[in-house]
C-alpha cells in the first residue's frame, strides 16, 4: 500500500504538468504588451498600443519604413505545435497576418523571411486592387494573385489558397480565427468565424513543391531582404508567433493558445 501511494505521488506532478501545458492560455495580460515584443526592437520601434485588452497596430504611429525594417509583434515564447484563437478586425483596404516559426536572428530583416503567414486582408480588394492600403506594391500583389487566391484571406500566403474561400465580416467588424499548427501530424488548418476555410500540410513533397513554385524560392531576387533572402523560410518548426505590421490599423483581442 505504501509503495502504491509513493508511486502515485511521483506520477501526479508529471500528469499535472502535461495537463497544464495543454490548457488554453490567455496571451493578453494586464491590459499590456506583457509577454510580447516588437521584432528586433532596440527601444526605438513603435506602432503598438493596448486599449481594453485589445492590441492595436497603427502604421501612422510606427517609426518604421516597412521596406527597410519591421515593427511586427512577436511572442516572447517560442512555440512548436499549437492551436491559437483570436479575434481581429482591420480598416477598409487593410492587411495584416499571423505568422509562426519566426526567427529573430539579426541576419534577417523581416519576420516573413522565416515565418509562414496566414493572410488577413479586406477581400473586397480583390475586386478593386487599388483600394488596398500600401500603394502600388500591395495592389500589384493582388493583381498577380487574382486567379490563384494564394494571398486571399485565410491563405498560407503565397503557398496554399483557401479551399473554401470566405470573405468574413467587413472592415470595422470583428472576425474570429482558430488556427492549428500541428507538426507531429503534419497538419495545419484555418477556421474563420466557425467555418473551415483552409487545410494544409506543413512539410513533405506537397509543401516543398508549392514553396518551389512561389516567391520563397526566388532568392536571387528581393535585394531589399539582404543577403539571406528567403533561405531561412519555414526551416524552423519551432519559433515565435507573430502579428504583422502593415499599412493601416489592425486590432487583435481574445488571443488564446493551447500547445499540442
Enumerate the language-model features and the residues they cover.
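Bacterial Sec-dependent N-terminal signal peptides
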Residues: 1-23
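Carbohydrate-interacting regions of secretory-pathway proteins
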Residues: 17-260
